[in-house]
């Protein structure tokens, strides 16, 4: 588990923005991919959502019929979860697995109940893109669990790195179902911090007086906030991208990133 944090040999990195350019996280991931590719080679695998079609393909993904072919042919995944494997067209040209996750919508009540019982994640107040993010995260985690079993040799140390609240439920799934895989969680900005600013409240003027749980209830952000907080507290390693965001996490999530 946490021993795998040091000198890992296999790295899975999951984000909604793998091969899916939405915002700044895409830039963060694509910038570091070249360095990680030199370190891990074909043991670096990015996992992203398959939100594409033949009519609207990803301009950043080149599918391969040979990469991880044996695993794909023999992978045991829940019905409806499918993958496409290829290369992400960024510096380093890393392997990417795109995951089709729509089938998990029908099972969301089961998973939400499980996450409440195990980690006290409150999905009762979910709305908007919460279901989409969680379905993807769970499917990605199932893929990571399956693929890591195929790739790993006896002495391999595996890390699964999850970015943002949208992948938090995947981290919790790995924590519960594949505890030998070390987990890293990175937030690029807290969901409740974004909501405070989005509601025209002065985040930094009254920063030390904000309580994340209280503000989540006030702004109807309980689900995203509780998921993000649970992921941060349960990860083997919690990180962020700047000191100011680390301060935000410490105040609103009640845990200081490394």
Which sequence ranges carry the predicted segments?
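Catalytic cores of nucleotide-sugar-dependent glycosyltransferases that transfer UDP/GDP/TDP-activated
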Residues: 1-258
């Amino acid at each position: 588990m946490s021993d795998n944090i040091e000198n890992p040999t296999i790295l899975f990195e999951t984000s909604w923005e793998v091969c899916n350019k939405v915002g700044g996280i895409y830039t963060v991931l694509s910038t570091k991919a070249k360095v990680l590719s030199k370190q891990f080679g074909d043991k670096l695998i990015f996992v992203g959502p398959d939100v594409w079609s033949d009519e609207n393909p990803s301009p950043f993904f080149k599918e391969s019929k040979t990469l991880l072919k044996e695993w794909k042919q023999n992978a045991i995944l829940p019905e409806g979860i499918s993958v496409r494997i290829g290369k992400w067209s960024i510096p380093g040209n890393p392997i990417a697995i795109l995951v089709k996750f729509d089938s998990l919508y029908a099972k969301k009540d089961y998973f939400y109940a499980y996450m409440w019982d195990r980690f006290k994640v409150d999905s009762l107040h979910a709305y908007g893109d919460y279901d989409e993010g969680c379905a993807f995260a769970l499917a990605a985690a199932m893929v990571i669990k399956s693929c890591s079993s195929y790739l790993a040799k006896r002495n391999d140390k595996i890390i699964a790195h999850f970015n943002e609240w949208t992948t938090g439920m995947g981290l919790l799934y790995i924590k519960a179902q594949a505890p030998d895989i070390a987990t890293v969680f990175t937030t690029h900005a807290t969901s409740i911090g974004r909501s405070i600013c989005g509601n025209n409240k002065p985040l930094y003027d009254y920063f030390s007086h904000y309580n994340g749980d209280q503000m989540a209830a006030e702004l109807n952000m309980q689900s995203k906030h509780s998921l993000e907080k649970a992921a941060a507290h349960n990860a083997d390693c919690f990180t962020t991208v700047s000191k100011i965001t680390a301060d935000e996490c410490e105040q609103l999530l009640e845990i200081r990133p490394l």
